[in-house]
Amino acid sequence: MMAGGTLAAVDPGREKCGFAVLDAHGTVLFQKVIETLNLVHEINDKYDRYAFRVLVLGNGTTSKEAKERIEEMLPDLRVALVDEYRTTDMAKRAYWQARPPRGWRRLLPVSMLVPPEPVDDFVAIILARRFLEGAASGDV
């Protein structure tokens, strides 16, 4: 299904969203935390650049509204809902792997640290990889 293509993922929120574009192997091509008001513009911009055919959307509380807006804007784009369970915890760990703590913070267990910036973009990456794993196993 995803052979050779790209996919986008969104962790929708009321004020901000995580957004990421990955290739079929799960390599991150783009990631960003964006204001929800700019979501449609950002998706459109990256759609033109990366030509993804699937957009993975976290199934949280604002997913229905986000799905409707995206499908209205890009009717040919397949929007797939993915379970968000525990993705925030996973995203915090991924954040610290990508940006290891410095100074005295490196002495603390990562589970005790709070990232200094939103991790919604890392959540989007996790959602995309969950989708890819499901596609590889035939669950999607």
Per-region residue spans from a language model:
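Phosphate- and other anionic-substrate recognition elements at nucleic-acid/protein interfaces
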Residues: 2-10, 14-140
